[in-house]
Amino acid sequence: MAARLCCQLDPARDVLCLRPVGAESCGRPLSWSPGALPPPSPPSVPADDGSHLSLRGLPACAFSSAGPCALRFTSARRMETTVNAPQSLPTTLHKRTLGLSPRSTTWIEEYIKDCVFKDWEESGEELRLKVFVLGGCRHKLVCSPAPCNFFTSA
């Protein structure tokens, strides 16, 4: 079973953050609307420990209250800077967390929607997800089962 993470835009830093949703949560957050400030992380989710989630091979920063730095690094590498990211990308990711059907217009939106979120939600374990999330992050992994060669696993 895949752990649930919600994607939120941090307008103060112009970055996208993944935040763990507690096991006791019954659904995806619906209170945030595009253009509004994202809701704070659920208080029932520990900010420093990912052992309650079923994901493995994620960097330790994935469970921080600020969200994983890996996503910020990967976004910066693929889109030059996170500030220059397409304005529709946060909307697309937000729609995906709500289970809506976003109309993506760029290759990076399609990549995230189809290769990352879909495989993550449906199978819970996807090599391309690991490559995307771990790329560029220097934090230690959480419960990593074995070393992985990210250059040959995609």
Curated annotation (Swiss-Prot):
Keywords: Activation of host NF-kappa-B by virus, Activator, Apoptosis, Host cytoplasm, Host G2/M cell cycle arrest by virus, Host mitochondrion, Host nucleus, Host-virus interaction, Modulation of host cell cycle by virus, Transcription, Transcription regulation
Processing after translation: A fraction may be phosphorylated in insect cells and HepG2 cells, a human hepatoblastoma cell line. Phosphorylated in vitro by host protein kinase C or mitogen-activated protein kinase. N-acetylated in insect cells.
GO biological process: DNA-templated transcription; symbiont-mediated activation of host NF-kappaB cascade; symbiont-mediated arrest of host cell cycle during G2/M transition; viral genome replication
The keyword Transcription belongs to this UniProt entry's keyword annotation: yes
GO cellular component: host cell mitochondrion; host cell nucleus
Domain of life: Viruses
Subcellular location: Host cytoplasm; Host nucleus; Host mitochondrion
Ranges for region Mitochondrial targeting sequence: 68-117
Similarity remark: Belongs to the orthohepadnavirus protein X family.
Function: Multifunctional protein that plays a role in silencing host antiviral defenses and promoting viral transcription. Does not seem to be essential for HBV infection. May be directly involved in development of cirrhosis and liver cancer (hepatocellular carcinoma). Most of cytosolic activities involve modulation of cytosolic calcium. The effect on apoptosis is controversial depending on the cell types in which the studies have been conducted. May induce apoptosis by localizing in mitochondria and causing loss of mitochondrial membrane potential.
Subunit structure: May form homodimer. May interact with host CEBPA, CFLAR, CREB1, DDB1, E4F1, HBXIP, HSPD1/HSP60, NFKBIA, POLR2E and SMAD4. Interacts with host SMC5-SMC6 complex and induces its degradation. Interacts with host TRPC4AP; leading to prevent ubiquitination of TRPC4AP. Interacts with host PLSCR1; this interaction promotes ubiquitination and degradation of HBx and impairs HBx-mediated cell proliferation.
Protein's UniProt name: Protein X
Species name: Hepatitis B virus genotype H subtype adw4 (isolate Nicaragua/2928Nic/1997) (HBV-H)
